[in-house]
From Swiss-Prot:
The gene is glsA. NCBIfam families: Gln_ase (TIGR03814), PRK00971.1-1 (NF002132), PRK00971.1-2 (NF002133). Keywords: Hydrolase. It comes from Shewanella baltica (strain OS155 / ATCC BAA-1091). This is Glutaminase. The keyword ATP-binding does not apply.
Length: 304
């Protein structure tokens, strides 16, 4: 376990970067977040959690939720049913690209871009009676925090600005790769993105990725092989168009969200969550990436 002093050092080391990025402003509920917040939490495979900075401050997890939705799908479907509808390759286009969906005849490149996550949400909608409730149940169980909830204001705000995601869904439907009612699936998807959690919650919830598929309670969520495969996808496609830069600087599987959070994993050791709302040009937390880079250097850890 890293010492608390190291986590505090990491936060203070990157604090001067605050002010150099840009808070997501495509929906008002995200634009109003305090840009000066910064936090980090780590959870070890022994179940111990440490944090520094604003690590107990809840934020909108946004695309980090795509890890949970894919994990949930893996517990409900045969793998062939999932991967026949969504690929495993890095995108190379923006995360909300329509062009790529058209070129690839409705099959999204990976489950971590919007098109791929919408297909996963479509799969969950068709298999679960109450997909929003099931997701809430899962993240509360994984984080050991029954106060985790959806931010209704964020979900509603996303829905009011949903034209592009609706276009992606309808385009996939035209290719036969979207089964459900678009409006219903969009509402479910936006609720997933509107989950509100803090760094401690997320570092605990993602521990299964560091612990061979076993959650913080020791329950097996997905198999050891599935965990390894999921980490591989996170390493290649988890950071929008910044996955290569992140692998170079940080060297860990990770997933970011435009709320400023990033989760990362050192397999066999620990899961990490950092948060700072200001983003770089790829939509990844600027100070968050720097915190993870500094931590990986100080710990001497990389998967490469």
């Amino acid at each position: 376990m890293p010492e608390l002093a190291l986590l505090e050092e990491v936060v203070e080391k990157v604090r001067p970067l605050l002010g150099q990025g840009k808070v997501a402003d495509y929906i008002p509920a995200l634009a109003s977040v305090d840009a000066g917040k910064i936090g980090i939490a780590v959870t070890t495979v022994d179940g111990e959690t440490l944090g520094a900075g604003d690590y107990l401050e809840p934020f909108s997890i946004q695309s980090i939720s795509k890890v949970f939705s894919l994990t949930l799908a893996l517990t409900l479907y045969e793998e062939a049913e999932i991967w026949s509808r969504v690929g495993k390759e890095p995108s190379g286009h923006s995360f909300n690209s329509l062009v790529q969906v058209e070129l690839e005849r409705g099959k999204p490149r990976n489950p971590f871009i919007n098109a791929g996550a919408l297909v996963i949400a479509d799969l969950l909608q068709s298999r679960l009676g109450a997909p929003k409730h099931r997701m809430l149940e899962l993240v509360r169980q994984l984080s050991q925090n029954d106060k985790v909830c959806f931010d209704k204001q964020v979900a509603d705000s996303e829905y009011q600005h949903s034209a592009r995601n609706a276009a992606i869904a309808y385009l996939m439907k035209s290719f036969g790769n979207f089964q459900g009612d678009v409006d219903t699936v969009l509402r479910t998807y936006f609720h997933y993105c509107a989950l509100k959690m803090n760094c401690a919650d997320l570092s605990k919830a993602m521990l299964y990725l560091a612990n061979r598929g076993k959650s913080i309670t020791g329950t097996e969520l997905i198999s050891q092989v599935q965990t390894r495969q999921l980490n591989a996808l996170l390493a290649t496609s988890g950071l929008y168009d910044g996955a290569g830069e992140f692998a170079y600087r940080v060297g860990m599987p990770g997933k970011s969200g435009v709320g400023g959070g990033i989760i990362a994993v050192i397999p066999g050791e620990l899961s990490i969550c950092v948060w700072s709302p200001e983003l770089d040009g790829n939509g990844n937390s600027l100070a968050g990436t720097a915190m993870l880079e500094h931590l990986s250097q100080r710990l001497g850890r990389s998967i490469f």
